[in-house]
């Protein structure tokens, strides 16, 4: 990887720093802790090329797509990466049990390490995850894992399971006013859902490894990448007091030793003497010049300082604060979690003061008497 070059296509909801007043506040907390660039289609066996299948769109999935773009900095536009991912997904689709299923892939402009799928076949992968992978087989393991969730209809099944769990909890709650009984019901519901999600992840791993292997990619790519993600999370944890998994793949795809071992066991069933394809050189050439970490056009964090070269300003957080430049705002947390800071852009009605806005529900748990006004540089 070289430099910090690349092209971005921001989705709706991304911070527009010049759009309104800038708010920065130290808040006392209450006690407690892309645009869709390319579509894959089933390959035709000889004859004229068939038109690409399109992923079914509904108002709900369109809203979810826009929400995802807003949360992850919009779509990241890189033709070389798109070409590589398109070819990879085409091979995976042909090797899957449902070669008639179409997929639409969006690269997200986020340094977080994450990937996910909508039930319709819309797949999302962040440039942070792409940068962490070492070869095409590792990327294929992530894509095939998300395809497996679609093929196994995990989202639909999980929604049904959650609905049933909610009914059980409501029935138990309505049976009486025993808070201990209600708490026990809620705890059992959470445990059931966690166990259910864990089982789905293991199933998706097994299906995904099989798809990658049949597509002639190295089936051990999944285990290698799970290990890389865990090491990456541990490295981040040593540098920040914020949860490094907040927006990352590991928040919903825990890379436990058991899961890594499961991926290795699945790979052994498909490994051959000649091994599968890793395609490292092609992969490294495709990710050359990818933006790594934060998008400099949206500002970046260095230590306790936030800098925005494009708009020509910077500020430093108080000592013991850790900053995180998210898609929505710059967030700071004091060591121990007793105080937080948010640097944001809002449109305040002309008849409302900034102090009133700060205490009107902009953030939860803001002490109304804690808002103070000051003027900086006139």
Language model features with spans:
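Bacterial N-terminal signal peptides
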Residues: 19-30
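N-terminal secretory signal peptides that target proteins for export/translocation
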Residues: 1-14
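A periodicity- and composition-biased signal for non-globular, repetitive helical segments
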Residues: 13, 20-21, 265
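A Zn2+-metalloprotease active-site environment signal
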Residues: 32-318, 322-378
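Hydrophobic alpha-helical segments, especially transmembrane helices
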Residues: 15-16, 260
């Amino acid at each position: 990887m070289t430099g910090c070059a690349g092209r971005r296509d921001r989705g709706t909801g991304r911070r527009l720093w010049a759009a309104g007043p800038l708010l920065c506040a130290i808040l006392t907390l209450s006690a407690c802790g892309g645009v869709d660039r390319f579509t894959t289609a089933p390959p035709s066996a000889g004859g004229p090329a068939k038109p690409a299948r399109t992923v079914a769109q509904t108002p709900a999935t369109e809203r979810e797509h826009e929400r995802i773009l807003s949360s992850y900095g919009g779509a990241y536009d890189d033709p070389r990466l798109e070409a590589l991912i398109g070819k990879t997904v085409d091979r995976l689709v042909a090797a899957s049990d449902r070669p008639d299923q179409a997929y639409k892939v969006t690269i997200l402009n986020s340094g977080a390490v994450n990937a996910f799928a909508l039930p319709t076949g819309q797949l999302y992968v962040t440039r942070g995850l792409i940068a962490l992978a070492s070869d095409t087989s590792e990327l294929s393991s992530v894509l095939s894992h998300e395809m497996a969730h679609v093929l196994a209809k995990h989202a639909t099944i999980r929604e049904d399971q959650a609905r049933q769990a909610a009914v059980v909890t409501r029935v138990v709650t309505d049976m009486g006013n025993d808070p201990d009984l209600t708490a026990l019901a809620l705890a059992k519901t959470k445990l059931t859902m966690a166990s259910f999600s864990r089982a789905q992840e293991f199933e998706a791993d097994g299906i995904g490894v099989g798809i990658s292997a049949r597509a002639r990619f190295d089936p051990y790519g999944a285990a290698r990448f799970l290990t890389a993600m865990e090491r990456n999370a541990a490295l981040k944890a040593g540098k920040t007091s914020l949860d490094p998994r907040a927006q990352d793949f590991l928040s919903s795809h825990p890379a436990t030793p058991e899961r890594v071992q499961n991926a290795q066991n699945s790979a052994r069933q498909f490994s051959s003497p000649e091994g599968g394809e890793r395609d490292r050189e092609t992969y490294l050439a495709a990710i050359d010049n990818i933006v790594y970490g934060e998008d400099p056009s949206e500002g970046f964090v260095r230590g306790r300082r936030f800098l925005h070269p494009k708009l020509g300003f910077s500020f430093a957080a108080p000592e013991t604060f850790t900053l995180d430049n998210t898609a929505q705002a710059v967030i700071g947390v004091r060591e121990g979690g007793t105080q937080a800071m948010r640097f944001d852009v809002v449109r305040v009605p002309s008849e409302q003061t900034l102090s009133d806005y700060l205490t009107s529900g902009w953030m939860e748990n803001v002490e109304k008497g804690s808002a103070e006004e000051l003027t900086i540089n006139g």
